[in-house]
Amino acid sequence: MSRKQLALFEPTLVVQALKEAVKKLNPQAQWRNPVMFIVWIGSLLTTCISIAMASDVMPGNALFSAAISGWLWVTVLFANFAEALAEGRSKAQANSLKGVKKTAFARKLREPKYGAAADKVPADQLRKGDIVLVEASDIIPCDGEVIEGGASVDESAITGESAPVIRESGGDFASVTGGTRILSDWLVIECSVNPGETFLDRMIAMVEGAQRRKTPNEIALTILLIALTIVFLLATATLWPFSAWGGNAVSVTVLVALLVCLIPTTIGGLLSAIGVAGMSRMLGANVIATSGRAVEAAGDVDVLLLDKTGTITLGNRQASEFIPAQGVEEKALADAAQLASLADETPEGRSIVILAKQRFNLRERDVQSLHATFVPFTAQSRMSGINIDNRMIRKGSVDAIRRHVEANGGHFPADVDQKVDQVARQGATPLVVVEGSRVLGVIALKDIVKGGIKERFAQLRKMGIKTVMITGDNRLTAAAIAAEAGVDDFLAEATPEAKLALIRQYQAEGRLVAMTGDGTNDAPALAQADVAVAMNSGTQAAKEAGNMVDLDSNPTKLIEVVHIGKQMLMTRGSLTTFSIANDVAKYFAIIPAAFAATYPQLNALNIMRLHSPDSAILSAVIFNALIIVFLIPLALKGVSYKPLTASAMLRRNLWIYGLGGLLVPFIGIKVIDLLLTVCGLV
């Protein structure tokens, strides 16, 4: 679910942004943007010159200098406004989160168990390791892990999703977020962070932090813009002695106007806004990025590691068939499979119990009365089961059961291998059931590939992004599903160690890797990946290891994250192209006007036939300021994104923003020149 989007020019945000734009005229704020700092200095210099001219301290046209000075200040204000508006939109999103933070009291337990004596303490005094009790209608006072109990939790204040979720002790759904509300039952929670370090605190700080760190690409582009600015500064500085030697020295006001029109002020004024807006768009998709660096990395990703279940398939694998080994009755296999699944709360485990009930009327046994020992599934063992009445029953992946059988002195039957291959070739997942060292047979689990996913992978492939399916299934099943879904590669029988090794392998090849995860066992791989999207429903360890958190806990969101990242990079590249192309057109307006008196031959460059030198220079300066405002919507919303190859994207960029950057100034400056002339302002 996405958050409600703010209108692009929300009146309250515009007013606040205008106030902030004026505050940002402070030289300390301007220094952070070298290109606009040059414009700020030029504005100050021309203001002083116009005052001196008005006071007859200096010769010259005071009105013309004042007009140039005024529009240079407007240029700086518009650049400040673009950044302030982008920041204001992010802060507005953060304010909705601030409303979740409530000063409340918590029941701090003296012992880590339900029913223990409790002390009433302010929620903001809870420390990491404290144990609290929350009951129906209570606000959860801190981020933490559920150590006892289970409850329905309303997380809409953070995720925007109205449907309640279940949080319970054990497994990957034990993580809770401070500020959410208990709807029913109770939880005993161990706080996992100190005050000021909660997930909500980090979200708010991230979206409204004034000191946003620049990303590597942003730094590289800033260096390029500074280099261009220095080149134009030196070139402009040399023009005065040339014109003076020619007998008609160009005024400092005109030289400043020339410099401002030639340096890349358009992208210089919008660069910060593009970065802030990219993070804001990510938040609009209900994904929290810990930094702009993470959003930028998403745009550069060329390998996606996608979990099969929930991302590529619908994730509701159901037991469809019991296939007994030679000499074993199907009912005996079903009975053992049901016993091994009684404590398995996964959808697959419940479906095995139900299938046994439907096929052979095997009623679900009372777990408490069995006096059995249940063996939970782990990523390392890849088995689960039950020990009951001297019977040791296990179900799990083929390789895991094979190792288990051989470790217990048994032999894995060849006919079961054939049955496993048959199930796998059909795209189903085979689970093998064993009692002691005797293999009883195979359970077939069927899953369905999501509609339209193959087309989405084809689009990613066109963009040069490799898709890799991660699954715990055996190689045959994985290969069948990979072929059906259209992924480029797959990792079968995946373990946390195997995922980590695969990420490192791709990174060693110079690739950037993105993945999702929700469990504690995903934390090492999430920490290693370049873009790591942790599920909000996952464990605290997973959320701390990732550099993004998906509030909707939707693994498919990873593809959208990559799209948003690429859109931000495309927006930056497109506006840079437009800005530099702009400079070429402004060259034809201002150079002839500034130097035609000294070098009449330059009149040949006056292809726009502007009214007079003063109107030409003023028109170029006005256009230079106004174009920033006209491009603010594009900077905030991003350019339209289409999955294309890199070469096709470059061609499209050059045609639209390169050619557009050349033509728009010719039209704009000519129109402004006509208006100034008609109104008698020059």
From Swiss-Prot:
Active site per UniProt: 307
CC annotations in GO: plasma membrane
GO molecular-function term, one example from the UniProt record: magnesium ion binding
Bilayer topology annotation: Multi-pass membrane protein
Residues passing through the membrane, by range: 34-54, 62-82, 219-239, 254-274, 588-608, 616-636, 656-676
KW Ribosomal protein (keyword) present: no
Pfam families referenced in this protein's UniProt entry, alphabetically: E1-E2_ATPase, Hydrolase
CDD domains xref list: P-type_ATPase_K
Coiled coil: none
Superkingdom of origin organism: Bacteria
EC number(s) recorded for this UniProt protein: 7.2.2.6
Residues annotated as binding ATP: 344, 348, 377-384, 395
Description of how the protein assembles with itself and partners: The system is composed of three essential subunits: KdpA, KdpB and KdpC.
Cited function: Part of the high-affinity ATP-driven potassium transport (or Kdp) system, which catalyzes the hydrolysis of ATP coupled with the electrogenic transport of potassium into the cytoplasm. This subunit is responsible for energy coupling to the transport system and for the release of the potassium ions to the cytoplasm.
PANTHER family referenced in this protein's UniProt entry, alphabetically: POTASSIUM-TRANSPORTING ATPASE ATP-BINDING SUBUNIT (PTHR43743:SF1)
Name used for this protein in its record: Potassium-transporting ATPase ATP-binding subunit
Organism of this sequence: Escherichia coli O1:K1 / APEC
Gene (name only): kdpB
